[in-house]
A protein has these predicted regions:
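Primarily recognizes the serine-hydrolase "nucleophile elbow" in alpha/beta-hydrolase
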Residues: 1-62
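Short, surface-exposed alpha-helical segments at coil->helix boundaries
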Residues: 26, 78-82, 116
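Short alpha-helix in the alpha/beta-hydrolase fold that links the catalytic acid
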Residues: 63, 77-87
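C-terminal catalytic histidine-bearing segment of alpha/beta-hydrolase fold enzymes
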Residues: 68, 89-137
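Hydrophobic anchor at the start of a short beta-strand
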Residues: 13, 65, 95
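Glycine-rich, phosphate-binding/catalytic loops in enzymes
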Residues: 31-33, 83-87, 116
Length: 137
């Protein structure tokens, strides 16, 4: 309801989350998820960006997804995240996945770690999805 006031593009937004927040972002990235919650005037996210989540749900109408995790994450196994993205890819959904060597759960922005720069990579993925969405429109 406040997209113009906040200078937000309701057709080009992304959903971001880490750990439990990534579960929420991924679930809300499904095409009709927001409409089911009564937010009918907002289209699907252009991209979902998730960090270290054990969320495994997939559907053919999920949003393009960027994901990253540490190789030593004892809560969100990199293999489980990889399998989820492979299922999304099988639906033709664009994905990008990064495993950062030696990192555990909760590396945040990754400053000073193997994950340094992941935020810029995620933004680039999101921008590519917005560009593709505009091209296809």
């Amino acid at each position: 309801d406040h997209a113009a006031e906040l200078a937000v593009d309701p057709d080009g937004y992304s959903l971001w989350g880490g750990s439990a927040g990534a579960r929420m972002a991924a679930a809300l990235g499904r095409r009709d998820a927001l409409a089911q919650l009564g937010v009918a005037r907002v289209g699907q996210a252009a991209a979902v960006v998730t960090q270290y989540t054990g969320y495994t749900g997939t559907a053919p109408d999920d949003a393009p997804t960027y994901a990253c995790v540490g190789s030593r994450d004892g809560i969100a196994a990199p293999q489980a995240m990889r399998r989820r993205l492979q299922r999304l890819e099988s639906y033709g959904i664009p994905t990008e996945f990064h495993v950062y060597e030696g990192l555990t759960h909760g590396f945040g922005l990754g400053s000073g770690t193997a994950a340094a720069g992941w935020v810029r990579a995620a933004v680039s993925f999101w921008e590519a999805q917005m560009k593709e969405r505009r091209r296809a429109a």
